[in-house]
């Protein structure tokens, strides 16, 4: 049996809360959450996860959502270090996996610089949950040999700068985190770098949650599709030939959760798309 690791006084754990569904927490994450005396949590960590905290634990919201920041990163670093130095059992609870676009390095460095013991508990990342939700594999033997994760988040006032030539790989699946607002930029740059316009795309919002929405489209229709198909929840783009293998029946079922009026707006969008492309449907 591996050694049981608990949250000790004066220690920090960076814990992955997974994509949202509390049942996708690891057993270790659930136990660490229950042992903490203070939990600093992201905006995307839902109530179903926070309910697992000890009744006497302090819950401190330090989340960041689409430019609406409750705390800057430097302040978060100071808060978790101060709590640990005060002898608290600290859990820094992050959506998904802490080491994937989770600003883990800054918090690890801050703890180590202060002499605070710090450890990581991994979590299920959003791309895995999104793929499961649409019944697809992100890799496919002989077709999709690589998997690339990128974030479409750029600092305020700065352009999104990625190596589009490398990302436009027909033998790879591309997962774009925080990709909804940048869908047009992503599609235009990938096509300019040579990726085919009919490359399949899945837009997945609120992956793993009851309000999950799924929309299948293609790269050349992605910008219009993203404006119509999604709400205001966190969304991820999955791009690549492996998406042709998605379970479309399951996706159709999930699309029924679209908010009232979305279907009619999607139809209107497809009419506009048809005027430009001659195609009436964005589905694969």
Language-model regions, residue ranges each:
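Class I S-adenosyl-L-methionine
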Residues: 1-22, 27-121, 223-224, 228
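A contiguous loop/helix-start segment that scaffolds small-molecule binding in enzyme catalytic cores
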Residues: 2-3, 9-12, 85-90, 146, ...
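Class I SAM-dependent methyltransferase SAM-binding "motif I" and its flanking Rossmann-like core
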Residues: 2-3, 97-170, 213-216, 284
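Short, acidic/turn-prone active-site loops that include or flank metal/cofactor-
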Residues: 19, 44-46, 62-69, 124-126, ...
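Conserved active-site and cofactor/substrate-binding residues in soluble primary-metabolism enzymes
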Residues: 24, 28, 34, 44, ...
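Short beta-strand/turn micro-motifs composed of small residues
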Residues: 41, 94, 122, 151, ...
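Hydrophobic packing residues within well-ordered alpha-helices of enzyme cores
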Residues: 49-50, 111, 130-131, 186, ...
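Short hydrophobic/aromatic-enriched beta-strand-loop microsegments
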Residues: 57-64, 115-119, 138-148, 194-203
